[in-house]
Amino acid sequence: MADLDQVLAEIRRGTDEILLESDLLEKLKKGRPLRIKLGADPTAPDIHLGHTVILNKLRLFQELGHEVIFLIGDFTGMVGDPSGKNSTRPPLTREQVLANAETYKEQVYKILDPAKTRIEFNSSWLEPLGAAGMIRLASQQTVARMMERDDFKKRYASGQSIAIHEFMYPLLQGYDSVALKADVELGGTDQKFNLLMGRELQKAEGQKPQAVIMMPLLEGLDGVKKMSKSAHNYIGVSEPANEMFGKIMSISDELMWRYFELLSFRPLAEIEQFKQDIANGANPRDTKISLAKEIIARFHDAAAAESAHQAFIDRFQKGAIPDDIPEVELAAGEGLAIANLLKDADLVGSTSDALRMIKQGAVKMDGEKIDDSRMTLSAGTVAVFQVGKRKFAKVTLV
């Protein structure tokens, strides 16, 4: 039982909730390889560190000898998951979904062992259902049950539309578990309703209900919103090592511990020792460097991690301007306002962001801080602009 206790401790690490843990324990006690399912709708081409929280747990099950299925929702991706959304998602075309699916496979193999990963597409069983099968599936749940979802409840209360096909999404995801005869399904906390639907449909089909393991949603670089491309607070697993290093070093010291908990493979005792060292006066920056190097070595290699560390020292700690900054040519017209220049050069997301950064003293032109938010630049200007510690661009106005 000691070994089983250790396995459970590894599985529990970083999880938000396991439903039901007694079911999971019963399955593990049987000693056979379990069928572990993780589904992902390829709605965007890039996988970021937020996605890897669950993928890391899936990798653990591979290492424990279980059968791992990475399910690509090529069918459900065209429906659109309503989880956490305050409006109906625009549907993707089959071509978009399949193109994104190809990049998903390449990226997940940075984490999962390809030889131990079974890839499935849910169109294999959802398309053959046809109209009769879909109606039969829909008959297994009620509108009242669907309206128990917080996101649907809020949208209904605020007068936002809810499309009928959105009610189908949890049923389709749940049916995936029936088709695969899943023993365990992994998902984020925002997927709870969908994950539990799998248990209900499996019971209805006479199967043993899957255990559900929910992982927390990783906060993005801002430490507030969940990591996502739309929030511009993400680190993509395919980003260059130098870019990844700089982004990780930009997170707050408090958020660093959250990243250690959900992204690091270090023993918990070692992470606790880091905390103790900082309490005793160690510099949190050095601990953050250890985190950055660990993550970069995983998605690139150890040499890339060391190189990125050195580049970070040269660029930020010694104040050097990087050699590979983008060069941008902009039309000056009768004069280009500094806020518009920074936005057009992709150094900020909006002119209001530019004004805020200038006010904070975070904008430089050729190394000199810009204090005048109303500055206008004319044609012929050639200068290196810097926003914060990491963003540079050489701008030529014509």
Curated annotation (Swiss-Prot):
GO biological process: tRNA aminoacylation; tyrosyl-tRNA aminoacylation
Reactions catalysed: tRNA(Tyr) + L-tyrosine + ATP = L-tyrosyl-tRNA(Tyr) + AMP + diphosphate + H(+)
CDD domains xrefs: S4 (cd00165), TyrRS_core (cd00805)
Record's subcellular location: Cytoplasm
Enzyme Commission number(s) of this protein: 6.1.1.1
Class of this enzyme: ligase
One Pfam family of this chain: tRNA-synt_1b
Keyword annotations of the record: Aminoacyl-tRNA synthetase, ATP-binding, Cytoplasm, Ligase, Nucleotide-binding, Protein biosynthesis, RNA-binding
Motif position, 'HIGH' region: 42-51
Motif interval(s): 'KMSKS' region: 226-230
Superkingdom of origin: Bacteria
Keyword Iron-sulfur among UniProt keywords: no
Domain S4 RNA-binding: 336-397
Purpose of the protein: Catalyzes the attachment of tyrosine to tRNA(Tyr) in a two-step reaction: tyrosine is first activated by ATP to form Tyr-AMP and then transferred to the acceptor end of tRNA(Tyr).
Assembly with partners or alone: Homodimer.
Stated family: Belongs to the class-I aminoacyl-tRNA synthetase family. TyrS type 2 subfamily.
Name this polypeptide is given: Tyrosine--tRNA ligase
Organism: Shewanella oneidensis (strain ATCC 700550 / JCM 31522 / CIP 106686 / LMG 19005 / NCIMB 14063 / MR-1)
Taxonomic placement: Bacteria, Pseudomonadati, Pseudomonadota, Gammaproteobacteria, Alteromonadales
